[in-house]
Each structure stands twice: as structure tokens, then as C-alpha cells.
Amino acid sequence: MVLAKNCSFCGKAIEPGTGIMYVRKDGAILYFCSNKCRKNMIELNRVPRYVKWTNEYHELKKMRAKS
């Protein structure tokens, strides 16, 4: 059984056989669901918690609303 991976940028589940696996020079493996996520993280150096359409942003927003 093949396990589903989560996108390293937006946190969305990636179906087996789809997406992009990116390996950094230091050996870290990053999984991306789309070219949009890959470009935002690799080329534009954006942090997921500051981009409004990511799961990490929404989780942080919920935490702020509770306090």
C-alpha cells in the first residue's frame, strides 16, 4: 500500500503518482502538490504561515482567534 504524502508548502494531501518530489543538496526531501507550491517555496522563498491559502496560515489564524 502506497502512503499519501502531504505538500511541504500548502499541507494538502498528494495522491500517489502525482505531485513533485524535490531533493535539496543537503538531502532534505520536499513534496509539492503543484507547480504553484514549488515556485512559492523554492524560487520565491515564501514562508507558508504568511501565505493566506495554506493550511499552516489557517491553523495560525484559528489559534489567534481563540486567544
Curated annotation (Swiss-Prot):
Coiled-coil stretches: none
Zinc finger C4-type: from-to: 7-37
Cellular-component GO terms for this entry: ribonucleoprotein complex; ribosome
Cofactor(s) listed: Zn(2+)
Binding, Zn(2+): C7, C10, C33, C37
Cofactor: record remark: Binds 1 zinc ion per subunit.
Domain of life: Archaea
Record-stated family: Belongs to the eukaryotic ribosomal protein eL24 family.
Subunit-structure text: Part of the 50S ribosomal subunit. Forms a cluster with proteins L3 and L14.
Job of this protein: Binds to the 23S rRNA.
The name this protein goes by in its record: Large ribosomal subunit protein eL24
Organism: Thermoplasma acidophilum (strain ATCC 25905 / DSM 1728 / JCM 9062 / NBRC 15155 / AMRC-C165)
